[in-house]
UniProtKB/Swiss-Prot annotation:
Feature: transit peptide: 1-27
InterPro entries for this protein: ATPase_NBD, Chaperone_DnaK, Heat_shock_70_CS, HSP70_C_sf, HSP70_peptide-bd_sf, Hsp_70_fam
Protein name: Heat shock protein hsp-6
Keywords from the named record: ATP-binding, Mitochondrion, Nucleotide-binding, Stress response, Transit peptide
The encoding gene: hsp-6
Biased composition (Basic and acidic residues): 644-657
Any Pfam family: HSP70
């Protein structure tokens, strides 16, 4: 155990004057840098075009992609809208809102709460983390996030027509070190080089302030998304975006609003029909989708109908759910959730030493910020009508793209100064949390403090690193621990152990301890007792590459099958159209070839794309020869007819002469 009572040195903070100058020209990334908002409910990808960020549409033509991953019985992995569409019939293997589990332990109260409401299995991994299970296989939340990031990567590559390797990925401002590290792991598994992890409210502020006139301004960003809530106070001054404070709740968002409404609907249905829908997974999934839809509709209308015919069945027959939901009733159901956003806003103002009257603009970010009651609450907190200058669903990705352009050197007049959201410290004598870096300290930063031994003859010290605001160490989040050994025996209070905390621009923590007497040093990049090891990450990368290859094969097979079915359809249509022009024996041979090709397609699961291609090509060549001959016959007949008409037309002329 360390003692903070002896040899307490003055705090030493090494300020870094400019993040922009820290990256040398040789370090600048090559190629495009995309910005990705990896959201709980939806994700979005953006790229800079000149000096303007552009949100890229996905394959379905939509600018946001559901952060949903599903695994089918035949081993296919679906991501985005296709995964969400089949959730009702495959709810146990459809993973959503897994961002709420990222970097969390299985025993965390938040995880235990989610266990009761999600249709898929949340399991305890060997390292104690919360993982998920689908089709009998377990996945870390980082892996699931990687599948979504891969979809975003593919979306950008399809638009740009080139490979993309570099990205800036956003995280909730109130994410702790474990959650930030797990997000970086997700990027690595997906094949992306994550240049920077930046906070979502900060990214939204970048999108808001990039093209604004120079001038000092303090703004607040109220970010209520699908799974998390953040509030940040920023000062914008001539291209410098300085975060003054941040606060939030990493387990408060649209998912909780959905759960509250589903709970209400289950209760109403049980009261009316006497049936408990929680026993029926398929009914619950339909109810979840209906609740989400109703929630969205009530942002623009005062009443909505929830109609779910044949929601379930009992001995008396099928049961239907049909009820009206008013905006007022919905606001009553989720009122406590909205109230939970008030205190973090007050704390953020207090920590920034800013009065609400000094806030020039309040930006609304995240899908839930569209709810009228949420907007009214924001107006009450800050005393002004919130700004709608940014798109709540797209601003974060756009800000990430701007930061990517800054790192690439394409945007040179923007400087982002972010903060660490939670205090960092170590456990000292008596279990006290001794803070070395307090919350809302600008990052990157480095700070050292000298401690001593707590007992006579102590030859080693254990450094336990915590993150949080509680006075007792064990009440905070344990990030990791390590030991400094080989300290010469001496009376308590004599040895001098210098502990240094270093937080990089991603908010990732490095800790070192050095015995000043012997010069011995021990240092680690903080990785909690959970988290993914290097070997696990490598295995997941290999698995992702293997899956990518399998997906490419599956895609090729689907494309070949579609091509084959198209050729068969066209051939049969033309055979019908030109039936009287085609030789019967050759038509019969072509029909036999069509039947053979159809047999191959019926057995497509056991056929290779090459075999189907070959059958297609043979069919196409055979049909082309037949139709070419028919065309020539028709042309010859038409030519003969034209000649006869010309001859007939000449005869009257001769008679006149």
């Amino acid at each position: 155990m360390l003692s903070a009572r002896s040899f307490l040195s003055s705090a030493r903070t090494i300020a870094r004057s400019s993040l922009m100058s820290a990256r040398s020209l040789s370090d600048k990334p090559k190629g495009h840098v995309i910005g990705i908002d990896l959201g709980t409910t939806n994700s979005c990808v953006s790229i800079m075009e000149g000096k303007t960020p552009k949100v890229i549409e996905n394959a379905e033509g939509v600018r946001t992609t559901p952060s949903t991953v599903a695994f089918t019985a035949d081993g296919e992995r679906l991501v985005g809208a296709p995964a969400k569409r089949q959730a009702v019939t495959n709810s146990a293997n459809t993973l959503f809102a897994t961002k709420r589990l990222i970097g969390r332990r299985y025993e965390d109260p938040e995880v235990q709460k989610d266990l009761k409401v999600v249709p898929y299995k949340i399991v305890k991994a060997s390292n104690g983390d919360a993982w998920v299970e689908a089709q009998g296989k377990v996945y870390s939340p980082s892996q699931v996030g990687a599948f979504v990031l891969m979809k975003m990567k593919e979306t950008a590559e399809s638009y740009l027509g080139t490979t993309v390797n570099n990205a800036v990925v956003t995280v909730p401002a109130y994410f702790n070190d474990s959650q930030r590290q797990a997000t970086k792991d997700a990027g690595q598994i997906s094949g992306l080089n994550v240049l920077r992890v930046i906070n979502e409210p900060t990214a939204a502020a970048l999108a808001y302030g990039l093209d604004k006139d120079a001038g000092d301004k303090i703004i607040a960003v109220y970010d209520l998304g699908g799974g998390t809530f953040d509030v940040s106070i920023l000062e914008i001054q001539k291209g410098v975006f300085e975060v003054k404070s941040t606060n939030g709740d990493t387990f408060l968002g649209g998912e909780d609003f959905d759960h509250a409404l589903v709970h209400h609907l289950v209760g109403e249905f049980k009261k009316e029909q006497g049936v408990d829908l929680t026993k029926d997974p398929q009914a619950m999934q339909r109810l979840r989708e209906a609740a989400e839809k109703a929630k969205c509709e009530l942002s623009s209308t005062t009443q909505t109908d929830i109609n779910l015919p044949y929601i379930t069945m009992d001995q008396s027959g099928p049961k239907h759910l049909n009820l009206k939901l008013t905006r007022a009733k919905f606001e009553q159901i989720v009122g406590d959730l909205i109230k939970r956003t008030i205190e973090p806003c007050r704390k953020a103002l207090h920590d920034a030493e800013v009065k609400s009257s000094q806030i020039a603009d309040v930006l609304l970010v995240g899908g839930m910020s569209r709810m009228p009651k949420v907007q009214a609450t924001v107006q009450e907190i800050f005393g002004k009508v919130p700004s709608k200058a940014v798109n709540p669903d797209e601003a974060v990705a756009m800000g990430a793209a701007i930061q990517g352009a800054v790192l690439a050197g394409d945007v040179t007049d923007v400087l982002l100064l972010d903060v660490t959201p939670l205090s960092l410290g170590i456990e000292t004598l008596g279990g006290i949390m001794t803070k070395l870096i307090t919350r809302n300290t600008t990052i990157p930063t480095k700070k050292s403090q000298v401690f001593s031994t707590a007992a006579d003859g102590q030859t080693q010290v254990q450094i336990k690193v915590f993150q949080g605001e509680r006075e007792m160490a064990t009440s905070n989040k344990l990030l990791g621990q390590f030991s400094l050994v080989g300290i010469p025996p001496a009376p308590r209070g004599v040895p001098q152990v210098e502990v240094t905390f270093d937080i990089d621009a991603n908010g990732i923590v490095n800790v070192s301890a050095r015995d000043r007497g012997t010069g011995k040093e021990q240092q680690i990049v903080i990785q909690s007792s959970g988290g993914l090891s290097k070997d696990q990450i490598e295995n997941m990368i290999k698995e992702a590459e293997k899956n990518a290859a399998e997906d490419a094969k599956r895609k090729e097979l689907v494309e070949v099958i579609n091509q084959a079915e198209g050729i068969i359809h066209d051939t049969e249509a033309k055979m019908t159209e030109f039936a009287d022009q085609l030789p019967k024996d050759e038509c019969e041979a072509l029909r036999t070839k069509i039947a053979d090709t159809k047999k191959i397609l019926d057995n497509k699961d056991n056929e290779t794309p090459e075999a189907i291609k070959e059958a297609c090509n043979t069919l196409q060549q055979q049909s082309l020869k037949l139709f070419e001959a028919a065309y020539k016959n028709m042309a010859a007949k038409n030519s003969g007819g034209d000649a006869q008409e010309a001859k007939t037309a000449e005869e009257p002329k001769k008679e006149q002469n």
